[in-house]
Amino acid sequence: MKFGELYMNGGAVVIDGTRRQLLPDHWVNHARTVVANDAVTETQYGAHWWVWPQCENSLVATGYEGQYTVVIPEKQLVMVRLGKTDTSLRPAVMHQLQQIALKVTNL
């Protein structure tokens, strides 16, 4: 969650009421710079993050055994999905997360 919040806040955290920039502010934007497309999942890859083209400015981290962190800064949203998922079910889990993200971004 904290990792997602770091990116949601443009690379900054608030400690004792003081905003501190931990990452250069341009780095978060760089993370969204698409360097590859995945035609199977209809996602794009940036700098160490996946990007969902249908959710503008999203950042998505995929982790071990089907864990996900989804960041949509404009909606102040960080979704974290912890749980073990069989490989065959992961596309369905990702699709469900995308549907949630789309509903939130269209509010």
Residue ranges and their predicted role:
Residues D25-V78:
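Active-site Gly/Thr loop motif
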Residues R90-L107:
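Short, gly/Ser/Thr-rich active-site loops of penicillin-recognizing serine hydrolases
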Residues R19-R20, R32, R81, R90, ...:
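Arginine residue identity/basic-tract feature
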Residues T85-T87:
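A short acidic/small-residue loop/turn micro-motif
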Residues M1-T33:
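Active-site-proximal binding-pocket segments
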